[in-house]
């Protein structure tokens, strides 16, 4: 048999009277009670002066009760919707007489009390529908049994309720200043500076206050409860159990919820396909694009790492650190500034151009070939880390590649064509490169390179005064120059990386570091290997060896540096 809510209220009535001291409250007893979570967990009783959290299933109303014993009692009720709009109403029902009509002093039977309340509808004091934090405040409320009924018609949702009969002394929510707006004081491409007036709760009432700033791209929020619900929306741990999947339908029917007749009858029955589908829904749900930052008691904050030309919504919440209850300022929104339009560099046919790109930066180049109907060749020499190159012709993307070292791209020509080159730098640091665009195939300033530009050292051929190394060549006859430099034994890969600018040629080296230069090529690409013994070294010393290959146009490319060490004892 399903219990009537009024019947539940009468059963809970002694608990209400015992757990609440209305209108006067025993503070020591109250503090002990609100610390006892078991007392208020999943209870229909609203404790006086404490905020409770609840959960609503869609279209299933929930009712809460509290008793005011004396007339002319101040009353304040605050309802905070979280992730969905709520409909709620507050009604007043007069308390039944405790004594029977004969004046025997014996209480009326429970069934008669229940019938007396059910027959009387009660008086509706307030109702609201929406997602705002809404208040019911009365300076003089009559005695009686108060019922708060809440329902969510949109979806399952969280909510919070706070009620007190001493609103003048109980001020757990921070008070807003006379101007509760959040102002944008500075706006950049990736930063926004916000400012707001401090809450009087901190300056006047000397209560511990901290501010939390929330940033997102969708809309402003009216409560931290709504923010946290949004942030936890993709968390499988927060998912509400569903009838027929997590529980037997009987479990829900027992508690007054409608069950799905098509749900599995076995508590543990769940088809594997459904299970894997549910798991995919949980694991593939995208992360919510929202950020919450608590900044202490400062009332100025700069939000950084934003995207240019993007609209963001900003909310500020004052949080009472003693009660962990919060109040929302009037949020704002702003669009970050656009990226500064970069100057497009014009490439000259057959001329090498040096390009510098900031970390994560982008550069645009334009090329109008002299002979537009001829094939067009782009030669790129990335000096440091890999860079990204995209080439478009008349708006159409022709190529998109990552370039490390030297790469060459050849495109079919088109009359009166114009090319737009987009270069994107490395995430690790600044990028440097040399680029040549030409419609004249014989204009190739960079030498051809093998796929592997490492230098190999032969450990067994090491002596106290020499090392033997080898490197790959190509079918094209090129000039190779070898340089050596003594380094400390603790010379690390990080040191080597700082000197790995492949665009620096032999002209930047000391004459004393030069070992030799020689020409080399092989018609058989599989045999294009050359070896060299570096002599005149000191025993037990470390050296950095570099090999430069010289191009016909005078531009050189450096192979990957190699650290070698001579034997200490021979």
UniProtKB/Swiss-Prot annotation:
Span of domain Fibronectin type-III: 261-333, 447-566
Q: Where does the signal sequence lie?
A: 1-19
Instruction: Recite the UniProt keywords alphabetically.
Output: Glycoprotein, Neurogenesis, Repeat, Secreted, Signal
| Keyword DNA repair carried by entry | no
Under the heading CDD domains, the entry gives:
FN3
- Which SUPFAM superfamilies does the record associate with it? Fibronectin type III
Kindly provide the name given to this protein in its UniProt entry: Protein NDNF
Q: Which GO terms describe its cellular component?
A: extracellular matrix; extracellular region
GO MF annotation terms: glycosaminoglycan binding; heparin binding
**Annotated compartments:** Secreted
Glycan attachment positions: 324
Q: What is its main location?
A: secreted
Quote the Pfam families the UniProt record gives.
NDNF, NDNF_C, NDNF_N
Q: Which GO terms describe its biological process?
A: cellular response to fibroblast growth factor stimulus; extracellular matrix organization; gonadotrophin-releasing hormone neuronal migration to the hypothalamus; negative regulation of neuron apoptotic process; neuron migration; positive regulation of cell-substrate adhesion; positive regulation of neuron projection development
Its biological function?
Secretory protein that plays a role in various cellular processes. Acts as a chemorepellent acting on gonadotropin-releasing hormone (GnRH) expressing neurons regulating their migration to the hypothalamus. Also promotes neuron migration, growth and survival as well as neurite outgrowth and is involved in the development of the olfactory system. May also act through the regulation of growth factors activity and downstream signaling. Also regulates extracellular matrix assembly and cell adhesiveness.
């Amino acid at each position: 048999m399903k219990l009537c809510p009024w019947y539940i209220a009468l059963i809970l009535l002694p608990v209400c009277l015992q757990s609440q001291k209305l209108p006067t409250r025993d503070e020591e007893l109250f503090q002990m009670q609100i610390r006892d979570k078991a007392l208020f967990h999943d209870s229909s009783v609203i404790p006086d002066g404490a905020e409770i959290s609840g959960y609503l299933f869609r279209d299933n109303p929930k009712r809460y009760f509290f008793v005011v014993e004396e007339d002319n009692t101040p009353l304040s009720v605050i309802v905070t919707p979280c992730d969905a709009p709520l409909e709620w109403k507050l009604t007043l029902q007069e308390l039944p007489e405790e004594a029977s009509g004969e004046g025997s002093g014996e209480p009326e039977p429970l069934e008669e009390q229940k019938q007396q309340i059910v027959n009387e509808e009660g008086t509706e004091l307030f109702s609201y529908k929406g997602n705002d934090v809404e208040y019911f405040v009365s300076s003089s409320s009559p005695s009686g049994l108060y019922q708060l009924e809440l329902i969510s018609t949109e979806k399952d949702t969280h909510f919070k309720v706070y009620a007190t009969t001493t609103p003048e002394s109980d001020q757990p929510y921070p008070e807003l200043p006379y101007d509760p707006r959040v102002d944008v004081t500075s706006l950049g491409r990736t930063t926004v500076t916000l400012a707001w007036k401090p809450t009087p709760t901190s300056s006047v009432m000397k209560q511990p206050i901290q501010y939390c700033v929330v940033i997102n791209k969708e809309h402003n929020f009216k409560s931290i409860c709504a923010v946290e619900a949004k942030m936890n929306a993709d968390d499988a741990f927060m998912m509400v159990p569903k009838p027929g999947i997590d529980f037997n339908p009987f479990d829900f029917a027992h508690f007054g919820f409608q069950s799905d007749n098509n749900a599995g009858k076995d508590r543990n029955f769940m088809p594997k396909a459904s299970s894997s589908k549910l798991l995919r829904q949980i694991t593939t749900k995208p992360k919510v694009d929202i950020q919450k930052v608590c900044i202490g008691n400062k009332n100025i904050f700069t939000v950084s790492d934003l995207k240019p030309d993007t609209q963001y919504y900003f909310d500020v919440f004052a949080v009472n650190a003693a009660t962990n209850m919060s109040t929302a300022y009037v949020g704002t929104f702003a669009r970050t500034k656009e990226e500064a339009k970069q100057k497009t560099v014009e490439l000259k046919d057959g001329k090498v151009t040096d390009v510098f790109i900031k970390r994560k930066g982008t550069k645009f180049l334009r090329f109008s070939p002299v002979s537009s109907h001829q094939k067009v060749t782009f030669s790129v020499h990335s000096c440091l880390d890999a860079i990204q190159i995209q080439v478009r012709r008349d708006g159409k993307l022709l190529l998109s590649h990552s370039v490390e070292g030297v790469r060459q791209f050849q495109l079919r020509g088109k009359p009166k064509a114009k090319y737009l080159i987009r270069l994107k730098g490395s995430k690790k640091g600044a990028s440097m490169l040399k680029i040549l665009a030409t419609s004249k195939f014989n204009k190739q300033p960079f030498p051809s390179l093998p796929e592997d530009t490492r230098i190999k050292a032969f450990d067994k051929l090491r002596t106290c005064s020499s090392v033997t190394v080898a490197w790959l060549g190509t079918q094209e006859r090129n000039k190779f120059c070898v340089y050596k430099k003594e380094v400390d034994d603790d010379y690390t890969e990080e040191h080597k990386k700082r000197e790995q600018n492949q665009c620096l040629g032999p002209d930047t080296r000391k004459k004393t570091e030069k070992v030799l230069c020689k020409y080399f090529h092989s018609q058989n690409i599989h045999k294009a290997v050359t070896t060299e013994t570096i002599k005149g070294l000191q025993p037990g010393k470390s050296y950095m060896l570099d090999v430069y290959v010289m191009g016909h146009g005078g531009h050189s490319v450096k192979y990957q540096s190699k650290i070698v060490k001579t034997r200490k004892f021979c």
